[in-house]
């Protein structure tokens, strides 16, 4: 999911790499690897919980963790955004592998499926995952991480490789990612762990082979945001029409019970006429900014998203974000296509009323 700020979206990972020092420790492989949810009395989430959410490693991580516990009755899975993979190793961000967080989530009946992003760009990643030896080393590193704590699986969130306009590279990445997910998911399943894949929303075949992923993965998380993003023109992060398009394609290619559509708990602040990228705001920051500047709240019915404008130092700013009203407007589209699974980017970012909206209240 810029990643320190926005954390997600098409350019998000790339900006993260320039904004964050990625010198986290290697995952300790000697740590005891208990089976998922093996503590006495632990009952991991059942199918009555239809939500998942990502837990950031920056900001007020304790508040984000408490947010998960407070809404444990709606969450079957939390994915701490803890790891990133290079060609043959996995590094942890600050706080990665926090056993207090893992144990606390398990006690609440929530699965812990950490997210792994990738650092290689599209061309390098294609080389890694197309080569059997290098692909095996990459999978080994992911499995080493998965076994280092009592994790319930792995969430593979590889977005850097999707950032290519070269058709040949894109096709090589697509074919290689199919091989990678085939191998990784099979080996995770052999260990009794889940294989989750997070993907960009697509309205047709592209880097991610939805049909293949729907066969090998336990769940496919579709990021239902950044239709307009920090490096582009101002506009809604998502829209009803766009949801219709990608849901139609997703449900044609992936079993409905494996699909999760993630909603944003953030927004973008575009300065009109200014060079550079839009600033990132969580819902809480956007709501506070609107109130501080006295801006009027507007809701765009066509997209199902709120927005407002304000002036700062003579420059007009346009802010688009998402709140509970917007989620309530867009959620029926998931139901229309028979999709029950939802996700949230990210814990601690969101409008508190989103949880009620997700319940249909």
Regions found by a protein language model. Give the residues of each.
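Substrate-binding surface in catalytic domains of secreted glycosidases
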Residues: 88-96, 140, 162-292
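Acidic/aromatic/glycine-rich contiguous surface patches that form carbohydrate-binding/processing clefts
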Residues: 330-361
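Secretory targeting and sorting signals
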Residues: 2-35
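Conserved, mostly hydrophobic/aromatic
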Residues: 78, 156, 220, 261, ...
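Short, well-ordered coil/turn segments that N-cap beta-strands
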Residues: 47-49, 74-76, 108-112, 150-152, ...
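Glycan-recognition patch characteristic of GH18 chitinases/ENGases
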Residues: 37-144
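Glycan-binding loop/region signatures in secreted carbohydrate-active enzymes
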Residues: 263-332
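A cross-domain feature marking catalytic cores of carbohydrate-active enzymes
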Residues: 55-57, 82, 114-118, 158-160, ...
């Amino acid at each position: 999911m810029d990643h320190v700020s926005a954390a997600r979206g098409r350019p998000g990972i790339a900006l993260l790499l320039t904004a964050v020092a990625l010198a986290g420790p290697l995952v300790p492989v000697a740590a005891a690897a208990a089976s998922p949810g093996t503590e006495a009395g632990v009952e991991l989430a059942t199918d009555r919980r239809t939500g998942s959410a990502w837990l950031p490693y920056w900001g007020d991580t304790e508040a984000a963790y408490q947010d998960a516990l407070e809404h444990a009755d709606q969450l079957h899975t939390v994915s701490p955004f803890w790891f990133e993979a290079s060609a043959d190793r996995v590094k942890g961000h600050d706080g990665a592998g926090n056993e207090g967080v893992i144990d606390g989530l398990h006690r609440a009946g929530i699965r812990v499926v950490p997210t792994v992003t990738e650092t290689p760009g599209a061309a390098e990643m294609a080389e890694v995952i197309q080569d059997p030896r290098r692909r095996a080393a990459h999978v080994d590193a992911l499995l080493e991480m998965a076994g280092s704590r009592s994790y319930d699986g792995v969430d593979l969130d590889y977005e850097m490789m999707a950032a290519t306009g070269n058709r040949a590279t894109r096709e090589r990445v697509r074919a290689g990612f199919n091989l990678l997910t085939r191998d990784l998911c099979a080996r995770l399943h052999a260990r009794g762990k889940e294989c989750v894949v997070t993907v960009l929303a697509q309205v047709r075949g592209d880097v991610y082979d939805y049909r293949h992923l729907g066969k090998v993965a336990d769940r496919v998380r579709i990021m239902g945001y950044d239709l307009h993003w920090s490096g582009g023109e101002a506009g809604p992060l998502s829209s009803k029409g766009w949801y219709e398009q990608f849901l139609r394609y997703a449900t044609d290619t992936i079993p409905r019970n494996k699909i999760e559509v993630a909603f944003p708990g953030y927004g973008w602040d575009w300065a009109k006429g200014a060079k550079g990228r839009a600033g990132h705001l969580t819902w809480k920051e956007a709501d506070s900014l609107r109130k501080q500047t006295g801006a009027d709240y507007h809701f765009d019915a066509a997209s199902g998203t709120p927005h407002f404008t304000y002036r700062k130092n003579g420059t007009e700013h346009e802010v688009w974000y998402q709140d509970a009203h917007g989620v309530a407007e867009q959620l029926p589209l998931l139901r229309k296509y028979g999709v029950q699974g939802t996700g949230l980017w990210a814990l601690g970012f969101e409008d508190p009323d989103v949880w009620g909206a997700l319940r249909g209240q």
